[in-house]
C-alpha cells in the first residue's frame, strides 16, 4: 500500500459515506466560421471548471482550441458538456490541454456529453489527450458527430486504465463510451459503444 493511502486514505474526497459532495457541471462551447478566406472564432461560451484556450498558430493554419478543465479531474456525479462546431468551409482543431482524469466514485457516474458539428465542406480534428481511469472510476461518455455533406472529421479518444508506472491499476469500475455519427437531419449513419 502506498504510504499516502495508509495515511490519508480515509479522508480522501471520494470516501464520503454518509456525506455529500458538491457536483460540478462544466460546459464549453466553441464555434468557428469561414470568413474573409480564413477560419475564425465565431462563438465561445464556457462555464467553470471548463475553459477553452487558443494557442498561437502560424499564419494560414486553422485555429486550435484547447479544451481544458481547471478542476483536476472528474469525480462521481460530475458532468461536462462540450460542443465544438465548424461552419461551412471552416477548419479547426480541438485538443485537450492535458489528460482527463476520472477518479474513484462513491456511487454516481461521471457524465460527459460531446457534440462535434461539421458544416458543408468543413474540416474538424477532435484530438483530446487520453482519459485516465482510476480504480473505482465510473465514466459515462457519449460523443455525437453531426457531419454535413462534404464535411470531414478526424476524431479519436484514448482510454487508460490506471497508471501502471505509479503502481495503480483499475481493478473495478464502469466505463461506457458511446459514439454516434449522424447527418444534419439526425439520421444515424454509424454507432459503436464500448462497455
Q: In which residue ranges do the predicted regions lie?
A:
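Terminal catalytic/cofactor-binding subdomain
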Residues: 2-111, 120, 170-195
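Well-ordered alpha/beta subsegment
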Residues: 12, 115-144
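An acidic- and aromatic-residue-enriched active-site/binding cleft used to recognize and process polar
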Residues: 97-99, 129, 158
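Extracellular beta-strand solenoid repeats
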Residues: 83-85, 93-95, 115-117, 125, ...
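Short acidic-hydrophobic catalytic motif
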Residues: 131-133, 138-140, 153, 157-195
Amino acid at each position: 500500500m502506498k504510504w499516502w493511502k495508509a495515511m490519508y486514505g480515509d479522508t480522501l474526497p471520494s470516501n464520503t459515506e454518509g456525506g455529500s459532495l458538491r457536483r460540478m457541471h462544466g460546459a464549453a462551447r466553441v464555434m468557428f466560421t469561414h470568413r474573409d478566406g480564413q477560419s475564425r472564432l465565431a462563438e465561445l461560451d464556457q462555464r467553470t471548471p471548463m475553459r477553452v484556450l487558443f494557442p498561437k498558430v502560424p499564419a494560414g493554419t486553422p485555429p486550435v482550441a484547447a479544451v481544458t478543465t481547471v478542476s483536476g479531474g472528474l469525480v462521481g456525479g460530475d458532468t461536462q458538456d462540450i460542443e465544438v462546431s465548424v461552419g461551412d468551409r471552416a477548419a479547426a482543431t480541438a485538443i485537450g490541454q492535458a489528460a482527463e482524469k476520472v477518479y474513484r466514485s462513491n456511487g454516481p457516474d461521471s457524465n460527459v456529453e460531446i457534440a462535434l458539428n461539421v458544416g458543408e465542406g468543413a474540416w474538424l480534428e477532435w484530438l483530446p489527450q487520453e482519459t485516465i481511469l482510476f480504480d473505482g472510476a465510473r465514466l459515462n461518455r457519449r460523443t455525437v458527430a453531426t457531419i454535413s455533406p462534404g464535411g470531414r472529421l478526424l476524431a479519436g479518444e484514448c482510454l487508460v486504465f490506471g497508471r501502471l508506472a505509479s503502481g495503480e491499476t483499475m481493478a473495478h469500475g464502469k466505463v461506457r463510451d458511446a459514439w454516434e455519427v449522424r447527418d444534419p437531419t439526425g439520421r444515424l449513419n454509424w454507432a459503436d459503444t464500448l462497455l
